[in-house]
Amino acid sequence: MHLTDLIEKTLTAMGYELVEVERAPAGLLRVYIDQAETGIVIEDCEKVSHQLTRVFEVENVNYERLEVSSPGLDRPLRTLVDFARFAGLEAKVTLRLPVNGQKNFTGIVQAPAGEPGQERIGLEFEGKDGPALLEFTLSELDRARLVPVLDFKGNRNKGNKQ
């Protein structure tokens, strides 16, 4: 079983979502997790770390060190579910190919719409001539991340708490 599939299967059984897996130099394995209803706290990371350590031992996964973390305020958006969940929030989007000479856009995410398999994601942004709408598919997307909203009055960004 592929490492990402193994991790995803384990996390799903525990009630968590796999956001990203990174292999870093010196055998470091980073796993980013989320939970739609409650977000992630340190105890979640501990629980997942202990479970993955056991699973990796049984499955003979080669790694030196494991880090489990929340995806952070600038969470990556990779799936239609991500874009639907974070509709209404600001994101930075980079397309694989330029649209009107531009690949990078920052704007408000709109929920995916369209026929299954042909869903298009909307991004409302400020164009040269005023408000504009970019529509793209996941296959046209290079990467996307939420834009962190820092509120120093103690309010948290809704990004991880929806």
Curated annotation (Swiss-Prot):
Keywords assigned by UniProt, alphabetized: Cytoplasm, Ribosome biogenesis
GO biological process: ribosomal small subunit assembly; translation
Annotated InterPro entries: Ribosome_maturation_RimP, RimP_C, RimP_C_sf, RimP_N, RimP_N_sf
Domain of life: Bacteria
SUPFAM superfamilies listed in its UniProt record: YhbC-like, C-terminal domain, YhbC-like, N-terminal domain
Primary localization: cytoplasm
GO cellular component: cytosol
Family membership: Belongs to the RimP family.
Function statement: Required for maturation of 30S ribosomal subunits.
Protein name: Ribosome maturation factor RimP
Species annotation: Ralstonia nicotianae (strain ATCC BAA-1114 / GMI1000) (Ralstonia solanacearum)
